[in-house]
Amino acid sequence: MSDLEPLDPTLQNILDQKSLKWIFCGGKGGVGKTTTSCSLAVQLAACRESVLLISTDPAHNLSDAFSQKFGKDATKVNGFDNLYAMEIDPNGSLQEMIESSDQTGGMGGMMQDLAFAIPGVDEAMGFAEIMKHVKSMEFSVIVFDTAPTGHTLRFLSFPSVLEKALGKLSTLGGKFGPMIQQMQSMFGGGAPQEDMFAKLESMREIITEVNNQFKDPEKTTFVCVCISEFLSLYETERLIQELTSYEIDTHNIVVNQLLFPKAGDNCEQCSVRHNMQQKYLKEAYDLYEDEFHIVKLPLLTEEVRGVEKIKEFSKMLTQPYTPPQ
């Protein structure tokens, strides 16, 4: 450990940074990402004009957390005037986009099949469609409850994926353009290759613009959520390295589900688990204390569900938790 004064062990720094537009909460499955992202959104709602909370995790836990049904449209969270939530499936939104815009007949379908044969294009376009939708809604700050680590940073490769798709379509168009146009005139309809090309190009522009914002520490930060165990800490280190390689700012770690046994408690399992957690917590401090705000949150005796419990829990993000003596 260094002699430097440790950073404030709260997420107050995020609330104070008014320039932030995009905040991601990510980590391994089951470490409390959703509770953390919901709690952070609640705290942001108290100091920012309007907040949108988005789940891109296929499990979609926002509805469970707030005990309120959310879908693909931004819906006001009960009890708030300026906090909205939505649950989206990138692949689902892509399918809807195709179905609603496929007016080009059979050849249009063929061009889409050719484009989607490139790995990742479907996800990339789904993500672009979501970002287009989100950008059209004027929110002060957007909080992402992301899919478990591994899927979290997939979107960073999307611009190059779409570049490949554009290149492939362009080549195909050059080779088969006259034949496609002849067949198209027989089938009737518009020019599918140009339509598809224009669609991919507009998606690529959106993703490139958004990715540039994601790499701006004034606009974007990533909150790593973990528990004090070997695998979770290892995953967090990998996540931080990956974020650093993509130039995405991260300087907050939430360590969730910590045990604080009461004095005189004879629970052997609690004691063993507490000692294990303290060992990995020390490792986390050794690794990150100089550059990260490390927030410690307790293991609770009941689930954090419903607005009131989330509000109560969210206070621990801005005021360090003190275990009862």
From Swiss-Prot:
It comes from the Eukaryota. One of its GO terms (molecular function) is metal ion binding. Gene3D superfamilies: P-loop containing nucleotide triphosphate hydrolases. The keyword Nucleus does not apply. Keywords: ATP-binding, Cytoplasm, Endoplasmic reticulum, Hydrolase, Metal-binding, Nucleotide-binding, Transport, Zinc. One of its GO terms (biological process) is tail-anchored membrane protein insertion into ER membrane. It is an enzyme of class 3 (hydrolase). The keyword Calcium does not apply. It is found in: Cytoplasm; Endoplasmic reticulum. The active site is at D57. One of its GO terms (cellular component) is GET complex. CDD domains: ArsA. Pfam families: ArsA_ATPase. Its EC number is 3.6.-.-. Zn(2+) binds at C267, C270. ATPase required for the post-translational delivery of tail-anchored (TA) proteins to the endoplasmic reticulum. Recognizes and selectively binds the transmembrane domain of TA proteins in the cytosol. This complex then targets to the endoplasmic reticulum by membrane-bound receptors, where the tail-anchored protein is released for insertion. This process is regulated by ATP binding and hydrolysis. ATP binding drives the homodimer towards the closed dimer state, facilitating recognition of newly synthesized TA membrane proteins. ATP hydrolysis is required for insertion. Belongs to the arsA ATPase family. Homodimer. This is ATPase GET3. It comes from Cryptococcus neoformans var. neoformans serotype D (strain JEC21 / ATCC MYA-565) (Filobasidiella neoformans). The lineage of its organism: Eukaryota, Fungi, Dikarya, Basidiomycota, Agaricomycotina.
